[in-house]
Amino acid sequence: MALLALLSGTVAAETTDSNQEQPKPKRVQTWGDLLDPDLPGVLTPKGSFVLDTSFSYTQNSSNSVSIVGYTVLPSLIVGLIRASDIDRTTLTLGLTGRYGITNRLEVEARIPWVYRTDSIFEREASSGTPTDTLRTVNGSDIGDIEAAFKYQINMKEAPYWIGSLRFKSTTGKSPYDVPVNDLNDFEELPTGSGFPSIEPGLTMIMPIDPAVIYANLSYIWNIKDDVEVDVTSGDQEFQASTIDLGDTISFSAGMGFSVNPKFSFSIGLSHKTILKSKIDGSTPSDAKLLQLDSLSFGANYAISPKTTLNIGATAGLTADAPDFQLSVRIPYTLK
C-alpha cells in the first residue's frame, strides 16, 4: 500500500502530461541504467527520511470443543468436555523510519508496541450442572523489532522490480516465556513470536494509466531455537526442546487507481501458506498446514506534499485468517 501511495501522484501526473506531449521513442535500457544510483525511482529518494506512524486493530474469533481427561471406551468419556468461544483483539502502534541511501536503495526499521486481549467464554458440558465462565487474559509490551533493505532493480522501463530483505528480532515476549496455568492456558499473552526470522521478497509494480498493478512474493524463514517447555504443572520441571516454527509463503496482488493527484484507492488479494512446525526434528501428529486468504481495500490521501493519510481494511476469507483488520498510517517526509 505504501508503494501505491508513492506512485499515485506520479501516475496522475503522467496522465495529465500525456494529453499535452507527443509520445517519444523508447530508448533501450542498458546495464549502466540498471546500476546508476542517481536515477529517480519509486522508493524513498536519496537523502530523504520518512517517519511513518501506524495503528492497527485486529479482531478474530474462534469456537472449539476440548476434552480435559481421556477416553476409556469410544462411548465412555472420563474427564470434562469444555466448549469455548474466544474473541481475540490486538492493537498495534508502530513507528517506522525509512531512509533513502540512494534513489534505488532504501533502509527501514520498525518498532511496534502490542496490546492483546482475549475474552474466553467456556462451558463445561459434561459436569452435573453446566457451568459458564468468562475469563479475560491481557498482554502488552514491545513487539518484535524489524529491519529491512529494499532495492529497485530497474529504473526506466516498467514493470518496476523491487527486491527486499527483512529481518525480525525477538524483542517481544515469547509464548514460551509467559506463565501458563494447569490447563496450559496463557495467564499473560505474548507480544512476539519467540523466534527470529529472515524474509526475502520480490515486488512488481506496473503503471497503466490511470491504474497501477502490483504483485508481491515473499518467504519467511523462521530460525529454529531451543526453548524450555513446562512438562509438569506441579513440581515445575522443564524440558528443553528444539522448535522449528513453520515457515510462511506469501503472495499478494492487486490494483491501485489514481482518482486525482491527491487521492487514490487500491484493492487486493493476499494468500499465505504456513507450513507445519517441527519439534526436535519431527512433525507432531496434530500439526496443521494453515491457509490464510484475505481481501484488502485501501485509500490514500495526500494531506500535503510531505504528509499522506493511508487507511486500509482487510477481511479474512478462510477460517485461519483474522476476521477483520483496520489500519491507519501517516507517513511524513522530514527531508
Spans of features found by a protein language model:
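Hydrophobic alpha-helical segments and helix pairs
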Residues: 140-196
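Extracellular loop and loop/strand-boundary signature of outer-membrane beta-barrel proteins
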Residues: 37-38, 79-83, 130-137, 185-190, ...
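Residues that define the transmembrane beta-barrel architecture of outer-membrane proteins
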Residues: 89-93, 131, 135-145, 159, ...
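Outer-membrane beta-barrel biogenesis signature
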Residues: 13-73, 77, 173-175, 335
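Repeated loop/turn-to-beta-strand initiation elements of outer-membrane beta-barrel proteins
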Residues: 105-107, 157-161, 210-213, 262-265, ...
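Residues on the lipid-exposed face of transmembrane beta-strands in outer-membrane beta-barrel proteins
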Residues: 39, 51, 55, 95-101, ...
